[in-house]
UniProtKB/Swiss-Prot annotation:
Residues 24-35, 98-100 are periplasmic. Its main location: membrane. GO terms for biological process: lipid A biosynthetic process; lipopolysaccharide biosynthetic process. The chain crosses the membrane at residues 3-23, 36-56, 77-97, 101-121. Residues 1-2, 57-76, 122-128 are cytoplasmic. InterPro entries: Flippase_ArnF, Small_drug/metabolite_transptr. Translocates 4-amino-4-deoxy-L-arabinose-phosphoundecaprenol (alpha-L-Ara4N-phosphoundecaprenol) from the cytoplasmic to the periplasmic side of the inner membrane. GO terms for molecular function: carbohydrate derivative transmembrane transporter activity. Disulfide bonds: none annotated. Belongs to the ArnF family. The keyword Endoplasmic reticulum does not apply. This is Probable 4-amino-4-deoxy-L-arabinose-phosphoundecaprenol flippase subunit ArnF. The gene is arnF.
Amino acid sequence: MGLMWGLFSVIIASAAQLSLGFAASHLPPMTHLWDFIAALLAFGLDARILLLGLLGYLLSVFCWYKTLHKLALSKAYALLSMSYVLVWIASMILPGWEGTFSLKALLGVACIMSGLMLIFLPTTKQRY
């Protein structure tokens, strides 16, 4: 059950990260504070996506809290690295994100996935 909550947390946090990235690239920069505030108060699509991203992070924290009650921290913390993989893949697949493929990034993803497999593979007890 802890693994399920952890996966929910990772998926929701990844979606929230993508939402915040979209909103940040479409809203006025915060250096133009009044324009930024006006865009938020207009509550257009960009502001709603920003709000969804923030609410997504809040929901992700709730799922993470449930994860930590059911799963060892050493395993739970490793799950967070999956978010990097999901966001990287989504940025290349989703239109308008302009995520780029590189062999270095692929190698990094392979390292992350290998590490997760090492952590989550069942261990066998050795007999002496």
